[in-house]
């Protein structure tokens, strides 16, 4: 698929995709994913063509931007590594997020409280989000999916080939997708200027690591306060000694 020069993959974005291991696919290749294979490593891991990934990502962004009401786009991730990315994508683009378990019947059973009638569905993994894809097929809702080389492509209308198992890869794809959607909508006018939002915001963070980091910061602050108190105490002691010496000199 040939793209206008404006949509060409920049060296900076290519470096981001490679740094996040977006190009590392599975050992097995599904028949519909064969056009996206660039090469195979000696250890059996297939390498995904990053150019194909970018082309499909731009195509998906153009589809999303064509929907007038952003809330009619539903972003889904049952996979833990993609839940933070889905929430950030929805916050920046106005889409409706479903992070966590997808309630069966959300697209087909209008009696349920979680019933929705979207015009487009985006999923992180066709396997973990199989229920959402299946229900979308029942009511003729187009589906965009982040697919690995061994992912099933049944009922998927637009497949973005990438590593959908790594937390950095998933977060980066959602980040780039959100950025391209905002550019197409005109929210980001200048394509030559970088987006003020960093990709790290879309990456999954382990709650235990966050708690440990907060605890370390608190410990560092306490240590700094203790050092400051010790310095103040030493200064007070020096001032007291100096005052006593001056008093002795005056008496003499």
UniProtKB/Swiss-Prot annotation:
Signal peptide: none annotated. One of its GO terms (cellular component) is cytosolic small ribosomal subunit. Pfam families: Ribosomal_S2. Keywords: Acetylation, Cytoplasm, Ribonucleoprotein, Ribosomal protein, Ribosome biogenesis, rRNA processing. N-terminally acetylated by acetyltransferase NatA. One of its GO terms (biological process) is cytoplasmic translation. It is found in: Cytoplasm. Disruption phenotype: Reduction in growth rate, a decrease in free 40S subunits, an increase in the amount of free 60S subunits and a decrease in polysome size. GO terms for molecular function: structural constituent of ribosome. HAMAP family: Ribosomal_S2_euk. Component of the ribosome, a large ribonucleoprotein complex responsible for the synthesis of proteins in the cell. The small ribosomal subunit (SSU) binds messenger RNAs (mRNAs) and translates the encoded message by selecting cognate aminoacyl-transfer RNA (tRNA) molecules. The large subunit (LSU) contains the ribosomal catalytic site termed the peptidyl transferase center (PTC), which catalyzes the formation of peptide bonds, thereby polymerizing the amino acids delivered by tRNAs into a polypeptide chain. NCBIfam families: uS2_euk_arch. PANTHER family: 40S RIBOSOMAL PROTEIN SA. Present with 93700 molecules/cell in log phase SD medium. This is Small ribosomal subunit protein uS2A.
